[in-house]
Design a protein with these regions (language model features):
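Alpha-helical junction/boundary sensor with strong preference for TPR arrays
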Residues: 122, 143, 173, 179-183, ...
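Amphipathic alpha-helical repeat scaffolds of TPR domains
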Residues: 86-119, 123-161, 193-209
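Inward-facing hydrophobic residues that define packing positions of alpha-helical scaffold repeats
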Residues: 115, 122, 166, 173, ...
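N-terminal cysteine/histidine-rich coordination modules
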Residues: 1-85
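Structural signature of alpha-solenoid helical repeat junctions
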Residues: 131, 168, 172, 188-196, ...
Length: 250
């Protein structure tokens, strides 16, 4: 994908910060124009001309409050106080404040920085395990996208950066996995907008990638015997079951 092509799918919308009440612009994707190409085994959506994950964070440029879109307005009074004390009091607004007028795509580095600020905010406000896990998962996905972008350049001088990105991808992936395990045990469904079977499949796929075959097998089996799981998630679970069996026989 090129920056010029990606920019065609973006626009700025006005958002009101629930912490400092400032109004600012944030970059979002024109979802009606985006075509789904495919999904990775762990549900990351692929689009041909834009990495939509880069634009799923809202960050107030005036006070520093930052969160994924789905969690941005979901704050208790106590959490607002924690954010003001733990984030806003230390935040230094950029001189330009709002988004630049020209709509340009975020680099992976900028998108990752925004997500890391969202994760820090989630820690400060004592957010749910699922919010922290989902944020970590998306950071991991961004590193995956950045690795693919860097590898496509086929430059020897990028080898060290690719290795660093891969280490970060794995670290945040493990953190996301552990967070979702906690969320399944302590939260009610839906979790992050996903029903029980979708979450179970996601965690099973993550467990498979991390080598936790016992967890992956248990969750896949629960999906396959469920009377309420849909055909799509059952098909995915069956494919994952075949991969698990193949892996165990290596």
């Amino acid at each position: 994908m090129t920056a010029e092509k990606e920019a065609e799918y973006l626009f700025d919308k006005n958002v009101e910060c629930p912490v400092c009440d400032s109004t600012f612009r944030t970059r979002v994707v024109k979802t009606g124009r985006v075509r789904l190409l495919e999904s990775d085994f762990d549900l990351i959506a692929r689009h041909p001309d834009v990495d939509t994950i880069k634009y799923d964070v809202v960050s107030c440029p005036y006070c520093g409050y930052t969160a994924l879109n789905r969690f941005f307005t979901d704050l208790t009074r106590g959490q607002k106080m924690l954010i003001r004390e733990g984030v806003c009091s230390k935040f230094h607004p950029a001189e330009n404040g709002d988004e630049e007028k020209k709509i340009t795509p975020y680099s992976y580095d900028k998108a990752i920085d925004r997500y890391k600020l969202a994760f820090y905010n989630a820690l400060v406000k004592k957010g749910r395990a699922s919010e922290k896990a989902y944020t970590c998962l998306k950071i991991s996905w961004l590193y995956r996208g950045q690795i693919e972008q860097l590898e496509a350049e086929q430059r020897a001088d990028l080898a060290e950066k690719i290795q660093t990105c891969r280490q970060q991808e794995n670290a945040y992936y493990k953190q996301a996995y552990e967070g979702f395990i906690d969320a399944i045990a302590s939260e009610n469904f839906p979790i992050c907008g996903m029903d029980e079977h979708t979450v179970n499949y996601l965690v099973a796929s993550m467990a498979y990638k991390l080598g936790h075959m016992d967890v992956a097998s248990k969750l896949v089996s629960a999906i396959l015997v469920s009377r309420t799981a849909g055909r799509t998630v059952k098909d995915r679970a069956y494919d994952l079951k075949e991969q698990i069996i193949e892996k165990l026989h290596e």
